[in-house]
Amino acid sequence: MPHKKSADGIGSGTRRQYLKTAGGATAAIASMTAGCLGNGNGNGDDVIRMGVLEDRSGEFSLTGIQKYHAQTLAVEEINENGGILGQEIEMIAPDPQSEVDRYRDLSRRLINEDQVDVLYAGFASSTREAVRPIVNENQQLYIYTNQYEGGVCDSYTFCTGAVPEQQISPVLPQLVDEFGPDIYTIAADYNFGQITASWYRTVAEEIGANIVGEEFIPLGVGDFGSTINNIQEEDPDILVTLLVGAEQAAFYDQKRAAGLDDLPMSTTVNMMQGYEHRRFDPPSLANMYVGVNYMEEIDTERNNSFVERYYDRWGDEAEYLGSMAQNSYFSTYLYKQAVEQAGTTDQDEVIEALEDGIEIEAPEGDIRMDPETHHMSHIIRVVRADENHNIEFTENLGEIEPFWLREGPGCDLLEEPDSSQYEPI
């Protein structure tokens, strides 16, 4: 049976009982207090208020800056083309600095003082879980754009990043077939790493593979000497790495120095988020495999246009355009499309539009919001880095639905309100 953890704020009854029923050339990037569009939260201002909390400093800024840049680009493009329903977006984007307490404080401020029409917030799962109880308490539309460990079934939260059944379930069996059944996992010691590791355990058991070792590394730790010794002692066929943040990234150079270049690696985060294949000296990432929904190297006309616009806008400030940045970009257009379909920024009606199987033309390809679970389908490609850190898209798996919440715990937010995170344990 799936294990269930709950965020505060949602009780029993139909979900509609709990939803709100309130009657320029560039984005306005601000952190001051102001109103929002009259038919949304009812402040009377003729702008759409978009709250954005992305880490532009601190432990997770490497990816947070990408996300902030991509969302700013989307807002600017939308405003340059007439806004949404003729209204410009005002993007209110204070820096949470990768600190959980700041996420709590700033979320309350954006919701209660700035009265945003929509909230985007968070890189780390710990920050998402700090925000969700506040979102549910205030019945606030919240879009979380990160790849994550999955399992959130929440009436007010829409998760637009990839989840384990899209990244692990289709990829790990291929690696086991090619390299062998013995797997060693090292993961960040918080909810993302712990739950994603449990996904690897679940899939490994289903395919007859073995988890021969598992370690959880506290955030901020950068010395992996004992971990590398343990890996060498177990001699696995595959190493799963679920490491997060600037300090934990030191593992890859230490692994290279220990002579483990030939050990195949599986992950859900590297290259697509932190562009380690660009930042680290070869062959630190050699034989890294990951199922990605997006990397800037995807060679399609649509994506090449997106990449060109991104670098034209940000110039030397832009170092890479990763999957989380792409998610933030298309999720801004997803909100635009939902508001236009609803004909209003009223959050109840925007949620109904998002739950209508809404589709979006993302840089990765055409994808769709799953109404019952509030998660996106994604186009998944298998990527491998060679000894020189050249990447190869070895297989296009096509569009994969976020099926586990429906088929496992039975999440159906059209029928039953919820605020839980379920785990495959």
Report residues per predicted region:
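Extracellular/periplasmic periplasmic-binding protein-like sensory domains
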Residues: K255-Y329, R406-D412, D418-P424
